[in-house]
Amino acid sequence: FYTREGSVTVALSWIVMSIMGSIPFLLSGSITNPVDALFETVSGFTTTGASILPAVEPLQHGILFWRSFTHWIGGMGVLVFLLCLLPLTGSGYHMNLMKAESPGPSVTKLVPKVQSTAKILYGLYLFLTVMEFVLLLVGQMPVFDSLCTVFGTAGTGGFGIKNDSFGSYSTYLQGVVTVFMILFGINFNVYFLFYMKKPKDCLLYTSPS
């Protein structure tokens, strides 16, 4: 399983996931145009944050949740997410998928077992997600709002559930989200090295070109 095949698999998986992800928008009637639904989904999975919706508050809670959740999945990468769930065979298969998709560590230098590393990355990702969720609840943000906000923050795409985005929330909540926008924006290789008890390597590491 070569690098080129890994890249093709990643590209095809993105296309399939995006088409499947647009189905909830169409079935709910929230977006009736298939192209618009696909645009919204691709924007979510790629964490671009662009939207064709003029207002989001009229949307059903289930659709708002799904819209934000696409950011959370896309934040670490759809294929890395699948690697955590699917028992794929062949180290070369894992290696090239991870290399083509992951925003985390350089698999050729730091990662002996790619599927295990994918699980570690998502474990760290989930840990930060839970931390932000709890801090938002402490600030008396409603549970649903907190959950959707965390997904949008983790993916760094910024999908919100209010028409004014985050303008109606308190200074404390804005501060929490600001801090976690920075934390989620940091290269996950830094967290990975700390997890592996190699903090000094963080200063020596440079992202592969």
Per-region residue spans from a language model:
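Alpha-helical membrane-inserting segments
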Residues: 16, 20, 24, 86, ...
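Non-catalytic accessory segments adjacent to catalytic cores
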Residues: 66-88, 118
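Hydrophobic alpha-helical transmembrane segments of multipass membrane transporters and ion channels
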Residues: 12, 16-20, 78, 119-131
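Juxtamembrane interface elements at the cytosolic ends of transmembrane helices
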Residues: 81-114, 126, 143-147, 183-202
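Long, contiguous internal "core" modules enriched in hydrophobic/ aromatic residues
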Residues: 111-151, 180
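P-loop potassium selectivity filter motif centered on the GYG triad
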Residues: 20-74, 138-187
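Conserved small/polar residues in nucleotide/adenosyl-binding loops
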Residues: 205-209
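Cytoplasmic-side transmembrane-helix entry/capping segments in multi-pass membrane proteins
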Residues: 2-11
